């Protein structure tokens, strides 16, 4: 979710410096080896699920036929499962302990627990394995946590072999909290069935030996799973409107007041669905021919160094399921979905699925808002955004585009969100910001409200602080301390890392980095090192020094002006030897010469500027100097030493000095100490102060209104 601005604006549910750097192989920007986007994933799992929703008891009763194909060279003797809904079973679960019953601005209701029971599990031959299923706690040893289960198999699965299981389960949905559940007759059904973990072969994500990767459900962790094919039959009361992952293939009205809907989707790693009798269905289409102009195709092809065929998109059917009171905003949601399909598709590769469903959660279902599942996303808005002036806040658009963006990272690239959340959340925050800027402009991408404009960078840096140095970006999602730090280290700081990188390598090079990464790793589960390798390859430079500091380290960037001043060059006094011989220059003689220099405007000034690195992280920066009546001079500092002194002898005094004048280093925790003005017009500073005061007042009043 867009945590920077939305956490402030919305109540639930809305709630030349680099030339000195070491080169990688080759020089300049390399021509990365790029192949076409993969058409299909390696389908390791096949799910055929039948589920019935009891809207009164809020329970699911289902059966699941699961086929798993061993992707490794190992003989595998057990399967590991996620039973996510057990995270909401009681106060002893790891999820509830870590969250304290509060997450993403939502509070768990103590009388509405959730759970899942596997009532039967058999092999295709009929062997009953139900009693063999045991819970495991691989992360924290909490014996009360039942979100992971291990199943020994009667016969091991050889390399390339398969096993099929028939599973029956009953699940109790909690009141909406943390991505799933119900609110009255609104249902978001996510992480709801017994789901296999990932058996990682040796070499995948750097593993030395093959093994299961199946983490417990933590408060700040999301998901990781193999790609496969899903066929799901959902039976619900006929009065309910259903939306789900994938394409609806069949609809059958039963004789008991229910209807069964069949959905199918391949090349995905999860399946979620929603139900609500109050949904208003808004149908639309993204047209690759009408929603993208020939000129836009041409510009993007040139930007990326790709052919027109490679950047040409496909049509997509869009379904928006709106709450009746938000129907006036349906066009905004549709357009945001179109904008996401357009720009993510152009920049990173065509969307490979035929459908996209956008869900508007019911009032009070805050825990269901701002969430992503394959081909299905949840947004989040308020009736207040129906009316001027709050309709100028782009919250519905930002949430919709951000959640759609996850289709490209969480859903297609599919990193392990438990262990490296930034590869989804951070990269998606960066790419969402780029889309918002492309659509609305960089100065007003987030807000255009009563004369105030706010862009992505304005909101992004709100959480940056000299004290934000206690966690590494690359870390297990549940390890950030305090737990609220997850948003900064998984979302905001990685986006600043990427934008800082872009500011130095250039927009075109960064666009090619991102395109290459997505093309190469679609459907393949990369790790951080794979992204870093693409950066080094495409830029032709080794950025290991940068990523080691900002991704694996905890320190911050902070440059400041230590001292700055201009002093009149005094005429010499005393016994002076010169070509004319030895002369005695008295104080009166020197003073006279100084007055003459002033009158003739030939006086000189010694200017000294001391710049300092307060933070531990270094980054090359420019330092800009403005002398009275002269053009700005820019010099490069590699930023490595603690201090550097610049000296000048000029006929003019120094007016101002500024480190990183273009504000390329978004990671700098304090831009206020980057500059110093010695003389000249102070009105620009006053103007900025007024704008920020207005910003603060506007935000506070907005929060009050909501």
Regions found by a protein language model. Give the residues of each.
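N-terminal, polar/Ser/Thr-rich
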Residues: 16-61, 220, 544, 559, ...
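Beta-strand-rich binding/interaction modules
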Residues: 243-244, 543-544, 556-661
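Solvent-exposed beta-hairpin/edge-strand motifs
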Residues: 78-130, 239-240, 626-631, 649
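Acidic/His/Gly-enriched intrinsically disordered linker/tail segments
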Residues: 300-305, 370, 376, 425, ...
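Glycine/proline-rich low-complexity spacer/linker segments in large multi-domain proteins
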Residues: 91-104, 170-226, 230, 282-287, ...
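Hydrophobic helix-coil surface modules that form long, contiguous segments used
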Residues: 196-212, 218-401, 430-433, 442, ...
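A surface-exposed beta-strand-loop module
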Residues: 69, 104-185, 222, 640-654, ...
């Amino acid at each position: 979710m867009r945590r920077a601005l939305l956490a402030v604006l919305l109540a639930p549910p809305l709630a030349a410096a680099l030339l000195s750097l070491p080169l990688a192989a080759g020089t300049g920007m390399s021509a990365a080896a790029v192949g076409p986007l993969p058409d299909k994933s390696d389908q390791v799992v096949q799910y055929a699920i039948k589920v019935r929703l009891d809207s009164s008891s809020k329970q699911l009763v289902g059966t699941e036929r699961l086929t798993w194909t061993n992707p490794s060279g190992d003989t595998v003797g057990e399967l590991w499962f996620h039973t996510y809904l057990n995270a909401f079973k009681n106060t002893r679960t790891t999820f509830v302990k870590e969250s304290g019953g509060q997450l993403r601005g939502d509070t768990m209701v103590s009388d509405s627990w959730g759970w899942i029971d596997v009532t039967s599990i058999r092999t295709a031959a009929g062997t009953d394995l139900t009693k063999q299923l045991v819970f495991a706690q691989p992360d924290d040893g909490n014996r009360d946590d039942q979100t992971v289960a291990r199943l020994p198999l009667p016969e091991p699965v050889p390399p390339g072999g398969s096993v099929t299981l028939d599973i029956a389960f009953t699940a109790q949905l909690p009141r909406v909290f943390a991505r799933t559940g119900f609110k009255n007759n609104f249902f978001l059904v996510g992480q709801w069935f017994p789901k296999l973990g990932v058996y990682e072969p040796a070499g995948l994500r750097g593993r030395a030996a093959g093994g299961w990767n199946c983490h417990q459900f933590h408060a700040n962790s999301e998901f990781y799973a193999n790609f496969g094919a899903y066929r799901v039959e959902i039976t619900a009361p006929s009065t309910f409107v259903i939306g789900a992952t994938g394409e609806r293939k069949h609809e059958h009205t039963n004789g008991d007041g229910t209807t069964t809907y069949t959905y199918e989707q391949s090349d995905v790693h999860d399946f979620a669905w929603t139900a609500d009798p109050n949904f208003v269905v808004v149908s639309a289409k993204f047209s690759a021919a009408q929603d993208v102009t020939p000129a836009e195709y041409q510009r993007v092809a040139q930007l990326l160094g790709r052919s027109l065929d490679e950047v040409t998109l496909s049509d997509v059917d869009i379904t928006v399921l709106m709450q009746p009171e938000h129907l006036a905003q349906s066009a905004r949601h549709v357009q945001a979905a179109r904008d996401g399909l357009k720009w993510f598709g152009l920049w990173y590769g065509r969307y490979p699925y035929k459908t996209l469903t956008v869900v508007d959660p019911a009032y009070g279902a805050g825990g269901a808002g701002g969430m992503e599942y394959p081909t299905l996303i949840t947004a989040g808005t308020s009736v207040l955004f129906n009316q001027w002036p709050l309709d100028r806040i782009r919250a519905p658009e930002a949430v919709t585009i951000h959640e759609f963006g996850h289709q490209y990272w969480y859903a297609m690239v599919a990193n392990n969100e438990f262990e490296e959340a930034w590869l989804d959340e951070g990269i998606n925050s960066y790419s969402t910001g780029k889309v918002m800027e492309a659509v609305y402009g960089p100065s007003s991408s987030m807000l255009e409200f009563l004369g105030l404009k706010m862009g992505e960078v304005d909101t992004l840096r709100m959480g940056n602080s000299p004290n934000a140095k206690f966690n590494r970006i690359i870390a297990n999602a549940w390890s950030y301390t305090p737990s609220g730090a997850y948003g900064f280290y998984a979302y905001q700081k990685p986006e600043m890392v990427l934008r800082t990188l872009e500011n130095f390598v250039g927009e075109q090079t960064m666009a090619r980095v991102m395109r290459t990464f997505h093309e190469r790793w679609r459907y393949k589960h990369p790790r951080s090192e794979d992204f870093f390798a693409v950066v080094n390859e495409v830029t032709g430079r080794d950025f290991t020094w940068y990523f080691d500091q900002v991704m694996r380290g905890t320190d911050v960037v902070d440059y400041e002006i230590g001292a700055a001043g201009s002093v009149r060059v005094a005429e010499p006094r005393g016994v002076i030897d010169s070509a004319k011989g030895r002369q005695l220059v008295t104080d009166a003689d020197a003073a006279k010469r100084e007055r003459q220099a002033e009158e003739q405007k030939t006086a000189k000034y010694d200017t000294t500027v001391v710049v300092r690195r307060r933070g531990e992280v270094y980054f090359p920066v420019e330092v800009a100097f403005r002398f009275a009546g002269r053009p700005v001079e820019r010099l490069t500092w590699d930023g490595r030493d603690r201090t550097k002194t610049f000296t000048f002898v000029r006929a003019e005094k120094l007016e101002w000095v500024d480190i990183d004048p273009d504000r390329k280093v978004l990671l700098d925790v304090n831009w206020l100490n980057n500059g110093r003005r010695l003389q000249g017009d102070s009105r620009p500073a006053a103007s900025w102060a007024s704008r920020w005061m207005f910003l603060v007042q506007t935000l506070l009043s907005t929060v009050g209104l909501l």
